[in-house]
Each structure stands twice: as C-alpha cells, then as structure tokens.
C-alpha cells in the first residue's frame, strides 16, 4: 500500500446557482466514495424521472435528501481522493447549520473552494454587495481558513470564452483581496462541472488556457485541473506539540469499565497514565486507557475522536462542553469573561450591552451576555471606527466583553484556535460569529482531585 495518504478537509462555497452541487458531485462521482451500485441505482432513477442527462448534482441531491431526512448516510460518500490526499467535503453551505458547523468545528477546513458561476449575470449576482459568496468567503477567512481555490464554473455556457474568464479572474481577485486572501496564492481554474472540462482531465475546449499557478513558500506551483489544484493544497500542521485540549462531546457510564468521556482531540496528545484536568468542572484524575473505534491506542492525536476511561469520576462530575487537558502543562480553566471580535451577520434589530444569546463554542452551548461594547471596528482591517458604541447591527463588527451565564472553558483564538471561535445563536439562526482575543481565567476553588490522581502523582 505504501504510505497512507494525508487527510484534508475542504469546504465548498459559492452562490446557490454557481453549480456547487454539480461540481462537488462530479469529483465525488469520479474520484470518490460512491460505489458503483449506488451510482447505477441513481442513474436508473434519473433516467426514469426523465433526468436522463444524469446531472452530477443528482448524486448530491440524493445524498442531501437522505441526510436531511436524518438518515445518516455513510460519510464516505462525501469523500474523494487525489493522488496525494484523502479529501473530505465539509457540509456544503446553504445548509442552515453550515455556519454553526463550520465554527463549532466538527471539522476545520484546510482549504475553501470558491465556485463562481461563469454565466452572464450569475457571477455578478454572487458577488454583489449582499451576495452570500462574500459572506462565506469572509467567514472562512475569519475562521482561519487561509488557503483558497477558485473554480470558474459553467465555462460551457460562455462559449468557452477567454475574455469572460479573464474578466471574472480580475473581479474575483479584487473581491478576495478585500476579504483578506492574497490572489497570487490562489489557483483560478476554468471548469465545466457538468461536462467535466478541467475537473480531472485537462480540457480540449479552451486552447487558450495555459494552466493555473500559485505562489507558495516553496516557490511557484503550476497545474491544469481542479483536481491538481486540490492536490497542491499545503498540508496543515497538526498541533501535536501544543498542550492537550479535548472538548467533551459526551460522557458515558459503561458497566464494568466506569466513566468514559468522548471527544475530539483538538491540540496536543492524550495518553494512558496522564493526569488530566477537566475545566470548568475542576476535576483532576488519571487516564486509564484511550481508545478509538473500539481499539486501544497508545496516544490520541489531533483530529482523533477518542473515548477514554477515567478513574473515580462520576458521570455527574463532568459533562459535554467541559474541556480536558494535561494537569501539568497549561491545564484548562474556567473563565469569568472574555473579549472577542464579533461580526454581526443577520440580526433583525440592534445589539447593545445586556444582550444574552446562546454561544456555541467547541462543544459548549451556553448563554453569554454582551457585557460591554468596547469599540466598533472595520470588519476587514480591524481598525477602530467608534469608541464604546451604543449598539451594533447587521454588517457591523465590534470588540465586546462577554460574560458567560455559567462556568465555561474557552481560549484565545491565537492560542487554541478550535476553542477560540464561536457562533452566536438566536431565533434559531446564527446571528453573529466571533473570535476570542483574550480570556479572564478563573483558578478553580476547592477542586476535586481523585485518589487515583494523587496516587499517580506520588509515583512520579
């Protein structure tokens, strides 16, 4: 088999009509996890329904419909392979909870693929002032997705026009520059997600197209197709050298074993024998064993979803939203308040001090109060526009002091990114997103230290 391929997550963004589904469907269909049987089944249905031209989007529509009906479809269906990577496509936007998912980070994207509809008027609609495209690109950038690929889709509907492609590249470059990306590091690929041009094989319909290029630290990288552009994503550094942070998703009580917290390692490493602290619960204990997919591990690494057995801790002591860390290496703590840069996305009214919506940060789901609006800032440059504003509204960005209604554990984005970004939820939608700048931490009072931890500590 040789060396296992690296794993990367991509998020596909773009206007609803840009052909996102067709393009994503095409990659998954040609390089991916959909087995032949499923495809044959879909093709048969498509033909029966008179969709015989078998749009790739049909594959994706089927997957989406199944997901929305709550049938958990095999996540493999959202995967495809490039020569270098196993790629997972993160929930395509347009889906209600997309923003929340992107922030609470079931999976942080390593790269965003922006799909632009090349047809007349489409491109303009997607990038207009209120366009979703702008919002998604800005969100991706704010939340730390620093690599971008632009696919100019539907080139077949433009008569494979070089002029149209160049016009879109120029406009899009300006647009992404305003968001914060450097266009020189971004491959621009003219494709037809429907006909397959430049998706996997180089096109024969655009003799003028010389290929894409992008600047990287290692020099200029060149290629022709979208698949090659995805293959040229720089591998993410997985933060194993940082102190452990593992937000709990659930805590189980398992007969004969005991208490088993479950969650995804965000930073650092968890190993059997480690003395860990749970914040804000203030419980310290020893890790007896660590396992993933029912196999025991010597170590759980960033990105691993693990269960681990802890000694002398009741299920009542710790819960979802708590964060587990190494008691001897920057242990996690609860916080009294934190300062964050908040971007208001869609709130019907005005937000002023005292507003108390629910925050989703990693696995925690807790009401927090906007205690003070410190300053209103320009959302692109971060420069101050107004000191102590009375209120902020949709489209504004501000620095705010937030106070959680009950103990919670968060971190500054620059220290531990996955624990430093949050979604503000109200009226069943994401009204704002935030990035935490600084945290006022609280040392636990009379913390519970289990006998196992004391014993293990004495041994060392």
Curated annotation (Swiss-Prot):
<feature type="modified residue" description="N6,N6,N6-trimethyllysine">
    <location>
        <position position="79"/>
    </location>
</feature>
<dbReference type="GO" id="GO:0005737">
    <property type="term" value="C:cytoplasm"/>
</dbReference>
<dbReference type="GO" id="GO:0005525">
    <property type="term" value="F:GTP binding"/>
</dbReference>
<dbReference type="Pfam" id="PF03144">
    <property type="entry name" value="GTP_EFTU_D2"/>
</dbReference>
<protein>
    <recommendedName>
        <fullName>Elongation factor 1-alpha-B</fullName>
    </recommendedName>
</protein>
<feature type="region of interest" description="G2">
    <location>
        <begin position="70"/>
        <end position="74"/>
    </location>
</feature>
<dbReference type="InterPro" id="IPR009000">
    <property type="entry name" value="Transl_B-barrel_sf"/>
</dbReference>
<comment type="similarity">
    <text>Belongs to the TRAFAC class translation factor GTPase superfamily. Classic translation factor GTPase family. EF-Tu/EF-1A subfamily.</text>
</comment>
<dbReference type="InterPro" id="IPR004161">
    <property type="entry name" value="EFTu-like_2"/>
</dbReference>
<dbReference type="GO" id="GO:0003746">
    <property type="term" value="F:translation elongation factor activity"/>
</dbReference>
<feature type="modified residue" description="N6-methyllysine; alternate">
    <location>
        <position position="316"/>
    </location>
</feature>
<dbReference type="InterPro" id="IPR054696">
    <property type="entry name" value="GTP-eEF1A_C"/>
</dbReference>
<dbReference type="GO" id="GO:0003924">
    <property type="term" value="F:GTPase activity"/>
</dbReference>
<dbReference type="InterPro" id="IPR004539">
    <property type="entry name" value="Transl_elong_EF1A_euk/arc"/>
</dbReference>
<keyword id="KW-0648">Protein biosynthesis</keyword>
<dbReference type="GO" id="GO:0006414">
    <property type="term" value="P:translational elongation"/>
</dbReference>
<keyword id="KW-0251">Elongation factor</keyword>
<keyword id="KW-0547">Nucleotide-binding</keyword>
<comment type="function">
    <text>This protein promotes the GTP-dependent binding of aminoacyl-tRNA to the A-site of ribosomes during protein biosynthesis.</text>
</comment>
<dbReference type="InterPro" id="IPR050100">
    <property type="entry name" value="TRAFAC_GTPase_members"/>
</dbReference>
<feature type="modified residue" description="N6,N6-dimethyllysine; alternate">
    <location>
        <position position="3"/>
    </location>
</feature>
<feature type="binding site">
    <location>
        <begin position="153"/>
        <end position="156"/>
    </location>
    <ligand>
        <name>GTP</name>
    </ligand>
</feature>
<feature type="region of interest" description="G1">
    <location>
        <begin position="14"/>
        <end position="21"/>
    </location>
</feature>
<feature type="region of interest" description="G3">
    <location>
        <begin position="91"/>
        <end position="94"/>
    </location>
</feature>
<dbReference type="GO" id="GO:0005829">
    <property type="term" value="C:cytosol"/>
</dbReference>
<feature type="region of interest" description="G5">
    <location>
        <begin position="192"/>
        <end position="194"/>
    </location>
</feature>
<feature type="region of interest" description="G4">
    <location>
        <begin position="153"/>
        <end position="156"/>
    </location>
</feature>
<dbReference type="InterPro" id="IPR009001">
    <property type="entry name" value="Transl_elong_EF1A/Init_IF2_C"/>
</dbReference>
<dbReference type="InterPro" id="IPR027417">
    <property type="entry name" value="P-loop_NTPase"/>
</dbReference>
<dbReference type="Pfam" id="PF00009">
    <property type="entry name" value="GTP_EFTU"/>
</dbReference>
<feature type="modified residue" description="N6-methyllysine">
    <location>
        <position position="30"/>
    </location>
</feature>
<feature type="modified residue" description="N,N,N-trimethylglycine">
    <location>
        <position position="2"/>
    </location>
</feature>
<feature type="modified residue" description="N6,N6-dimethyllysine; alternate">
    <location>
        <position position="316"/>
    </location>
</feature>
<feature type="domain" description="tr-type G">
    <location>
        <begin position="5"/>
        <end position="240"/>
    </location>
</feature>
<keyword id="KW-0342">GTP-binding</keyword>
<feature type="binding site">
    <location>
        <begin position="91"/>
        <end position="95"/>
    </location>
    <ligand>
        <name>GTP</name>
    </ligand>
</feature>
<feature type="modified residue" description="N6-methyllysine; alternate">
    <location>
        <position position="3"/>
    </location>
</feature>
<feature type="modified residue" description="N6-methyllysine">
    <location>
        <position position="390"/>
    </location>
</feature>
<dbReference type="InterPro" id="IPR000795">
    <property type="entry name" value="T_Tr_GTP-bd_dom"/>
</dbReference>
<keyword id="KW-0488">Methylation</keyword>
<dbReference type="InterPro" id="IPR031157">
    <property type="entry name" value="G_TR_CS"/>
</dbReference>
<dbReference type="GO" id="GO:0005516">
    <property type="term" value="F:calmodulin binding"/>
</dbReference>
């Amino acid at each position: 088999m040789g060396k296992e391929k690296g794993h990367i997550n991509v998020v596909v963004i773009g206007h609803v009509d840009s052909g996102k589904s067709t393009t994503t469907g095409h990659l998954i269909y040609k390089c991916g996890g959909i087995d032949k049987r499923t495809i044959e089944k879909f093709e048969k249905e498509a033909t029966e329904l008179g969709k015989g031209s078998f749009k790739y989007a049909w594959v994706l529509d089927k997957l989406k419909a199944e997901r929305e009906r709550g049938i958990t479809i095999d996540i493999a269906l959202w995967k495809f392979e490039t020569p270098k990577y196993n790629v997972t496509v993160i929930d395509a936007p347009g889906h209600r909870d997309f923003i929340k998912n992107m922030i609470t980070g079931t999976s942080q994207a390593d790269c965003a693929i922006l799909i632009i509809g090349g047809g007349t008027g489409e491109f303009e609609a997607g990038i207009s002032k209120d366009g979703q495209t702008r919002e998604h690109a800005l969100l991706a950038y704010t939340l730390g997705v620093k690599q971008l690929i632009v696919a100019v889709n539907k080139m077949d509907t433009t008569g494979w026009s070089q002029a149209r492609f160049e016009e879109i590249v120029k406009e899009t470059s300006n647009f992404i520059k305003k968001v914060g990306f450097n266009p020189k590091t971004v491959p621009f690929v003219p494709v037809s997600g429907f006909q397959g041009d430049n998706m996997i094989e180089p096109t024969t319909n655009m003799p003028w197209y010389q290929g894409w290029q992008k600047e990287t630290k290692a020099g200029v990288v060149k290629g022709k197709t979208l698949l090659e552009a995805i293959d040229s994503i720089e591998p993410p550094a997985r933060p194993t050298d940082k102190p452990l942070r593992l937000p709990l998703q659930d805590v189980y009580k398992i007969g004969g074993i005991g208490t088993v917290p479950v969650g995804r390692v965000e930073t650092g490493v968890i190993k059997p024998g480690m003395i860990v602290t749970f914040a804000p619960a203030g419980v310290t204990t020893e890790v007896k064993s660590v396992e993933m997919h029912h196999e025991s591990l010597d170590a759980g690494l960033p990105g691993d979803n693990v269960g681990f057995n802890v000694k002398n801790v009741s299920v009542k002591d710790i819960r979802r939203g708590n964060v587990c860390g190494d008691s001897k290496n920057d242990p996690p703590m609860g916080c009294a308040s934190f300062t964050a840069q908040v971007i208001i996305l869609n709130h019907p009214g005005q937000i002023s001090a005292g507003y108390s919506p629910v925050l989703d940060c990693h696995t925690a789901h807790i009401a927090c109060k906007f205690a003070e609006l410190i300053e209103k800032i320009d959302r692109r440059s971060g420069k101050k526009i107004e000191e102590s504003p009375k209120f902020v509204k949709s489209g504004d960005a501000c620095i705010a002091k937030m106070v959680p209604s009950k103990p919670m554990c968060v971190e500054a984005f620059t220290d531990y990114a996955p624990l430093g970004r949050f979604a503000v939820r109200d009226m069943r939608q994401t009204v704002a997103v935030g990035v935490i700048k600084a945290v006022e931490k609280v040392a636990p009072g009379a913390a519970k230290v289990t006998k196992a931890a004391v014993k293990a500590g004495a041994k060392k």
